[in-house]
């Protein structure tokens, strides 16, 4: 591999992210073509991938993608569920065309289909899951970049990026690193955190939304009785009780004129008396 600018070299944080996301964890099975990318085999039979090779291939693939003038000619594909959000975020940041979910057969070979595309390069998440897209791309001479695991077949794959393609954090981080490297080569940078590329379970998202709504409703209910209750108490207090409260607290204005004419009330009572 040729020398690359210092900005594209991995930092300690990048290596820590790769290790934390378990990008180097492979499977118990290994394809013979993946031997150059396997670091060693653990005692429990799990193959460990070489993170240095992973970073080299990410930079190599990013340089290929950055060389394409029209980003829409890049087609990013993920049939695996953990990569759906990642390819959509990648397409939003770079302007590529995303296919998240089931790949429609004939999208690259049958021009009659509504989903027909003619990309210059495709990037897939898993060669086993996205085998239909890889095979069709080989029919029409479209280069293929793919993330591969220790047991992934490399048939029709032109650029293989070794990594764990079965973990939600690993898949999201690999797509995030590829997106960031492409933008850096083009002179920009990625301001989105890796968490935005991670897969999120719809049930988990809905549950979090319900919990947030319940917490907000509970906070609203606890705040309302303090004001409404005080208003109800003040409205139900009799006038005499209110006067007593005012007297006890010393808030009575003794210089003010009385609201009731006691002399007039006495005269009226004598006039209406029936004793005479």
Curated annotation (Swiss-Prot):
Any one of the GO CC terms: cytosolic small ribosomal subunit
One GO biological process term is: cytoplasmic translation
Alphabetized, the UniProt keywords read: Cytoplasm, Ribonucleoprotein, Ribosomal protein
Q: What coarse category fits the chief subcellular location reported for this protein?
A: cytoplasm
What is any Pfam family matched here? 40S_SA_C
- Which InterPro entries has this protein been placed in? Ribosomal_uS2, Ribosomal_uS2_C, Ribosomal_uS2_CS, Ribosomal_uS2_euk, Ribosomal_uS2_euk/arc, Ribosomal_uS2_flav_dom_sf
Where is this protein found? Cytoplasm
UniProt keyword Ribosomal protein, yes or no: yes
The molecular function terms in GO held by this entry are: structural constituent of ribosome
- Spell out the residue ranges making up region: Disordered: 209-233, 252-276
| Ranges annotated as biased composition (Low complexity) | 211-231
The UniProt family comment states:
Belongs to the universal ribosomal protein uS2 family.
Q: Which HAMAP family match?
A: Ribosomal_S2_euk
**Function noted in UniProt:** Required for the assembly and/or stability of the 40S ribosomal subunit. Required for the processing of the 20S rRNA-precursor to mature 18S rRNA in a late step of the maturation of 40S ribosomal subunits.
Q: What's the protein called, per UniProt?
A: Small ribosomal subunit protein uS2
